[in-house]
C-alpha cells in the first residue's frame, strides 16, 4: 500500500491490501541483516554439523555474499557436551526456532532466551546443563535449528573402536531409517535401501545386521495381549504405548499419575537388545560381554533410552540416521552401486505391521491387527478428531466398542491427556509419538526435516510395507518360534523378565536446594524443611505454604529452628503439594500437617515430650 516496510508477523491482513515482498529496498535490507548475522556467527563451516545444509550458508550464497563488510564480533563460546544434545552458542543466530519448537510444539520449555542485547543467549532452564533439565531429548530443537548451534552427540567413533577391538558387533536398523537414508544419496523410492544398508555395514565389519521391525512385531504381539488382559480386568486403562522414550520421559515428568498406565513392554529397540544378549549370544556361542549391539535409529531420545538404568546395557551404542550417513559417506562407496543383502535370520523377518511402527498410527494399527487375530472384530473405523490426533473405534462381535487414539507431537499429547483426565475424551488404548508424523520425523533424521519431507517418508514406508507378504505380527513365524523356544507364552514370567520393564515418576530439574531461611546453628538443632516448588506442587499451593512457613518462623518461638529451603521435585507428584521435613515426605501438605510433623521432629531431637501442643 506504499507504506513503510513492516514485519509480516505483526501486520494483520485486510481486504484489498497490496503487498510487495521483493523490492530493491527489501533486498538491500535482507542483505544487510545477513551481513550482521554473519559478523556475529562462528564461520568455521568446514567442521560444522550443518555444513552444506545450513540455512544461513544457503542465504549467504543466494544473496552473493562472498565477503562480509562488517568485522566479526565473536560470541562467547558456550558449549554443553553433557548430554545427547550438544549446544554451541557461538553458532546461534537467535532465530528462536528451537525455543518455539520446544515451547509451542512440544510444550516442554527446556530452553529459552536469557539476558539482553548482544549478551542474549538461548540457554536451558536455570542455565543448567541440558541433561539436568526437563528436556525429553526428542531432538526437535535440533531438527529446527538452521545453523548447527544444536546438534546430536556423535557416537560413530565408539563403533569403529568396537570393531577395531575385535568385538562381535551386531547392528539393528529401525523401519524409519530406510525411508529417509536415501535422501542423502540421491535415491528416490528405493525399496532396496534396507538391503544396501546391510551390505555396507557388513563391509565395515558388522558380524550380523537385524531388523528392528522384527521386534516391533514382538512388541505389538505382547502389548496386544497386555491390553486384552487389562481390558478384561478393567484396570490401568487407558493403556499408553511406551515405544517412544521421549513420551515416556514426558509422562514421568508431567503426568506421573499415568505412569502405571504405560505399557510395561519394552520398546522394539530394547526388547531386541535384551533377546540378543540373553538368548542369541548363547546360540552363537559368544559371551554377551563381547557383543557390541549398535542400534540405528531415527530418534535422538533412543540414545537416552539405551542409557536408562532400567535397561542395564541391553543396547551399547545408538547411532541416528545422520550419523549413519557420515559412516557411509566416509567409506567412499557409491551406495547406489552396492548390491543389497537380506537381514540376518532369525531377527530379519517382519510383517507390514512391524514396518508401520516407523510412522504415526503404526503401533496402534499393529495392536489392532493382533487383537483381530485373537478376538472377533466386526468393524474398525478411523477418523481424525484434531490436528495430529486420530480416533480408531474397534467394534467387537459382542457389541463392545474399543476406542484407540493415535497422537503425535507432545503439544497435541498434552491436550489429549488433559482431556482424558477431565473426561472430555474417552479411550482404552493410546499410541503416543513425541515427534510430528512419528519416528519418520525424529530428531536424528536427515535435513531438511520439514512437513513435506516427513510426508514423503511416510509414503515411502507405505510402499515398502506393500511388498511385505506378512500382514499381522501373528503371522511372523520366527517370532512364534521365539515364544516356543524361550518366552513361552505372552505375559509369561519369562516374557516379563526379558521384554518387560517398569517406569517411575522423575524429577524435571536436577537442581540443588535453594536456601530460603538458612540457619547458622548446628545441624543437630535444625529441623530442615524443604518445600517443593516444581510445577505440580506449585500449581497446588506450595508457594503459599512457603510464605506461611516463613511467617511461622518469624512469629512463633518453637519454629525458630526451622531451616527453610526450596527444592524442585520430591518425586511424589501424585500427592502434591509436597514438603520434606528432615527425611520425611509430607504429601498433600497443609500448614497444619507440617506443624504437626515438625513438632514431632523437635520432640524426637530434644527428647522433650512436653513440647507445647498449643501451637497446633
Residue positions per predicted region:
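Structural motif corresponding to the C-terminal cap of alpha-helices
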Residues: 106, 145, 280-284
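Fe-S ferredoxin-like electron-transfer domains
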Residues: 2-137, 143, 150-169, 584-616
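Iron-sulfur-associated redox domains of electron-transfer enzymes in respiratory
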Residues: 1-30, 38, 153-616
Amino acid at each position: 500500500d506504499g507504506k513503510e516496510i513492516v514485519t509480516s508477523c505483526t501486520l494483520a491482513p485486510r481486504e484489498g491490501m497490496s503487498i510487495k515482498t521483493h523490492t530493491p529496498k527489501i533486498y538491500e535490507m535482507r542483505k544487510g541483516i545477513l551481513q550482521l548475522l554473519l559478523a556475529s556467527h562462528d564461520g568455521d563451516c568446514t567442521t560444522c554439523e550443518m555444513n552444506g545444509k545450513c540455512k544461513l550458508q544457503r542465504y549467504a550464497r543466494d544473496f552473493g555474499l562472498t565477503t562480509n563488510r562488517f568485522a566479526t564480533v565473536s560470541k562467547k563460546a558456550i558449549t554443553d557436551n553433557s548430554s545427547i544434545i550438544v549446544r554451541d552458542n557461538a553458532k546461534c543466530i537467535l532465530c528462536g526456532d528451537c525455543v518455539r519448537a520446544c515451547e509451542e510444539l512440544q510444550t516442554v520449555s527446556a530452553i529459552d532466551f536469557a539476558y539482553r542485547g548482544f549478551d542474549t543467549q538461548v540457554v536451558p532452564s536455570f542455565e543448567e546443563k541440558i541433561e539436568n533439565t526437563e528436556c525429553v531429548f526428542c531432538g526437535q530443537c535440533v531438527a529446527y535449528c538452521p545453523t548447527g548451534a544444536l546438534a546430536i552427540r556423535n557416537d560413530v567413533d565408539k563403533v569403529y573402536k568396537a570393531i577395531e577391538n575385535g568385538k562381535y558387533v551386531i547392528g539393528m536398523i529401525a523401519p524409519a531409517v530406510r525411508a529417509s537414508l536415501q535422501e542423502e544419496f540421491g535415491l528416490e523410492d528405493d525399496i532396496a535401501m534396507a538391503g544396501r544398508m546391510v551390505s555396507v555395514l557388513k563391509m565395515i565389519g558388522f558380524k550380523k545386521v537385524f531388523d528392528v521391525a522384527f521386534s516391533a512385531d514382538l512388541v505389538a504381539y505382547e502389548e496386544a495381549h497386555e491390553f486384552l488382559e487389562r481390558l478384561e480386568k478393567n484396570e490401568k486403562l487407558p493403556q499408553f504405548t511406551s515405544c517412544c522414550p521421549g513420551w515416556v520421559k514426558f509422562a514421568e515428568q508431567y503426568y506421573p499419575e499415568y505412569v502405571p498406565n504405560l505399557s510395561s513392554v519394552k520398546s522394539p529397540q530394547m526388547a531386541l537388545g535384551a533377546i540378543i544378549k540373553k538368548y542369541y549370544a548363547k546360540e552363537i556361542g559368544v559371551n554377551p560381554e563381547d557383543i557390541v549391539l549398535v542400534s540405528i535409529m531415527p530418534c535422538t531420545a533412543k540414545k537416552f533410552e539405551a542409557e536408562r538404568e532400567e535397561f542395564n546395557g541391553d543396547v551399547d551404542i545408538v547411532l541416528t540416521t545422520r550419523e549413519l550417513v557420515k559412516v557411509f559417506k566416509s567409506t567412499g562407496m557409491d551406495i547406489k552401486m552396492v548390491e543389497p543383502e537380506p537381514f540376518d535370520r532369525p531377527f530379519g523377518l517382519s510383517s507390514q505391521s512391524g514396518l508401520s511402527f516407523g510412522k504415526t498410527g503404526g503401533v496402534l494399527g499393529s495392536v489392532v491387527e493382533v487383537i483381530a487375530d485373537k478376538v472377533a472384530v466386526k468393524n474398525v473405523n478411523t477418523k481424525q478428531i484434531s490436528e495430529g490426533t486420530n480416533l480408531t473405534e474397534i467394534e467387537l462381535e459382542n457389541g463392545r466398542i474399543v476406542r484407540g487414539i493415535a497422537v503425535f507431537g507432545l503439544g497435541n499429547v498434552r491436550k489429549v491427556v488433559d482431556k482424558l483426565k477431565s473426561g472430555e475424551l474417552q479411550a482404552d488404548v493410546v499410541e503416543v509419538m513425541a515427534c510430528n508424523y512419528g519416528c519418520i520425523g525424529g530428531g536424528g533424521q536427515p535435513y531438511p526435516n520439514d512437513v513435506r519431507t516427513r510426508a514423503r517418508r511416510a509414503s515411502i514406508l507405505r510402499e515398502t510395507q506393500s511388498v511385505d507378504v506378512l500382514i499381522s505380527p501373528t503371522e511372523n513365524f520366527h517370532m512364534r518360534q521365539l515364544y516356543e523356544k524361550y518366552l513361552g507364552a505372552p505375559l509369561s514370567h519369562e516374557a516379563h523378565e526379558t521384554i518387560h520393564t517398569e517406569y517411575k515418576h522423575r524429577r524435571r530439574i536436577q537442581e540443588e536446594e535453594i536456601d530460603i531461611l538458612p540457619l547458622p546453628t548446628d545441624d543437630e538443632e535444625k529441623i530442615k524443611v524443604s518445600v517443593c516448588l516444581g510445577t505440580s506442587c506449585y500449581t497446588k499451593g506450595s508457594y503459599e505454604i512457603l510464605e506461611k512457613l516463613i511467617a511461622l518462623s518469624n512469629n512463633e518461638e518453637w519454629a525458630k529452628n526451622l531451616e527453610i529451603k526450596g527444592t524442585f521435585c520430591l518425586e511424589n507428584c501424585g500427592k502434591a503439594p509436597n514438603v520434606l521435613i528432615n527425611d520425611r515426605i509430607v504429601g498433600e501438605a497443609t500448614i497444619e500437617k507440617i506443624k504437626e510433623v515438625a513438632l514431632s521432629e523437635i520432640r524426637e531431637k530434644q527428647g522433650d515430650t512436653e513440647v507445647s501442643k498449643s501451637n497446633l
